[in-house]
Regions:
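Conserved alpha-helical scaffold segments that buttress catalytic/binding sites
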Residues: 1-224
């Protein structure tokens, strides 16, 4: 987050008419770099960070503002989307999530090859995972697979792919984009949106071509557009 501030992101947003309120950085436990326990790496730390982010995001939504979260591992999408889902239920709005990522992040502890929770956030949001994450906001699942629309996917583990098909997640992968173009993928993912739809965009930098954004943990070559 500090690098984004130094790079002038707040000023760039303000120049486009956005009223920016920088609330500073969230804080949480540091990464202990330990081995997986019962299929999960650093579960306690992930829960703590996501709980902090959920509370901060929900407070901003309650105040009538649009929270924008920058920086961090994409497992933090659990906290931000759980907050938005809760707010949408209370407001009677329909939530739609655009997940822009090179990975589907639909692993579970039963199929993950690594135990890294950054490969599991979408599954956790859909109710597949440890109670501490699937019930982070008190309701499980936080969202249904039908509310999740993924664009730019180009790395999926074999068993993860089976889970995605079983739960019918809407995925526009690189093959679809190569054949139909990014414009059509986005139009399809946004089809049916109306005035009562709340759109949440969750963006992992590895969605971009690594020649543009090389500084990611799991860089994959070439997203065409």
């Amino acid at each position: 987050p500090e690098a984004l501030r130094v790079a002038g992101l707040p000023e760039a947003l303000e120049a486009r008419g956005v009223d920016v309120r920088d609330l500073g950085n969230l804080d949480g436990p540091r990464n202990p770099w330990t081995a997986p326990v019962e299929g999960y790496r650093h579960l306690d730390e992930v829960v703590a960070w996501n709980h902090a982010l959920m509370e901060a995001s929900y407070a901003e939504l309650q105040a009538g503002r649009m929270p924008i979260m920058l920086g961090g591992d994409h497992c933090l999408g659990i906290g931000s989307i759980t907050a938005v889902a809760r707010w949408c239920r209370e407001q009677g709005k329909t939530l739609r999530v655009l997940w822009l990522d090179a990975h589907s992040d639909f692993n579970t502890s039963d199929v993950t090859p690594s135990g890294n929770i950054h490969g599991m956030p979408v599954a956790c949001l859909c109710g597949l995972g440890p109670d501490a994450l699937t019930r982070l906001g008190g309701t499980s699942p936080a969202i249904t697979p039908a509310q999740m629309h993924q664009i730019g996917i180009r790395s999926v583990d074999p068993e993860e792919k089976r889970l995605i098909k079983t739960h019918k997640v809407d995925v526009y992968d690189m093959r679809y984009i190569d054949e139909n173009g990014m414009k059509r993928a986005v139009e399809a993912a946004l089809a049916g949106i109306d005035e009562n739809t709340h759109l949440h965009v969750s963006f992992d930098v590895d969605f971009l071509d690594p020649s543009i954004a090389p500084g990611v943990g799991l860089s994959l070559i070439h997203i065409s557009e």
